[in-house]
Amino acid sequence: MERGEQMPKVNKHKKKKSTYYPDMCFGLCILLIVSFFFHGINVIVNFSVSVISAILFDYVGCKIIKHKFRVKNCHAVFIGGLISLMLPASAPLWLPVLGCAFAVFLVKTPFGSLNHAPFSSVSAGVAFLSICRPDLVFDYASAEFGTVSIARSLSQGTPVVTAVDLINAFIGTVPGGAGMTCAVAMIGLLFFVLLRHPKSFINSLFFLLTCFVGAIVLTAAETDKFFALNSMRIILVRMCSGYTLCMAVFFVTEEPLSPKKKGRRIFYSVMMGVVYIILGLVSEFEDAGCFAVLLTNAFWPVAEKYIFAPVRSKKEVTSVESAESLT
């Protein structure tokens, strides 16, 4: 560079490209490998068909609203992959395709882009399927792992949980969604979130803490001998059952929907955990995790307006008064 020639300006405020959805798709691939080990080739077929259909639906939706189609952000892959893994391995091919169509055309497309949609597309798709065909969405019966999932057995009373049952819940040899049963894999993905997205891990941590407190309270209310070994096992099994760990990894951390500030992240995560616990008590569905996500998405703007906005205004008034007193 010659003397007198100015250095090119560097835009320090250039927006960093988000790696959230590509990273989450990597996590889905890990779950796909685990579910293939347990359920066979049918899981890969369902996963592939679901992902391809989500990409095609997203492309059509972008054409309809004349929006630029971006497959590289991996959001469509995330929608298709997660919906398929939340369904049973025996689900018919059309079921995840229908869920993807609802998620893309009725949740994502009307709002123009993933950054403007007020609801989780995946949660909306699975919730829609749960309402329309609960017999297929929660049909977890299999010759290898039995007919009753952990969530169903816990809802029917206080079961006797043996050490073998606890081990099965950790390694994933229990009835459930194709990619939702292996607690070891989910815990590994939580550490992955911690490494790649430490701010999002705050969401996961406080959501799980809320669910853990809820599991303790429910177990204490249902059992006479709370400090018995069976009670401790029930608490651990509750944490591994249903969509609990899936929500901690994929839903409560979803960047476009999560608040940015730490305090609001904590409040948002605790809110989702509380709603999830309440719905687990009153809902007729085997797992109401997706409805908990949607309700939290719906009520979060209300919390922003009536809880955080007044606090912010009060702080601004206080700072102005302090500045005036100094002058």
Features from the language model and the residues they span:
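A generic, well-ordered mixed alpha/beta core segment in the N-terminal half of proteins
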Residues: 79-144
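C-terminal ends of transmembrane helices
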Residues: 8-11, 56-68, 104-115, 186-197, ...
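Loop-to-transmembrane alpha-helix initiation sites
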Residues: 118-122, 235-244, 265, 283-296
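N-terminal signal-anchor module of multipass membrane proteins
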Residues: 2-62, 316, 324-327
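Structural signature of hydrophobic alpha-helical transmembrane segments
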Residues: 40-52, 90-99, 169, 173-183, ...
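Hydrophobic, membrane-inserted alpha-helices
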Residues: 27-34, 54-58, 76-85, 100-107, ...
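Cytoplasmic-side transmembrane-helix entry/capping segments in multi-pass membrane proteins
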Residues: 69-79, 96-99, 116-126, 201-210, ...
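Long hydrophobic alpha-helical segments that form multi-pass transmembrane helix bundles
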Residues: 115-188
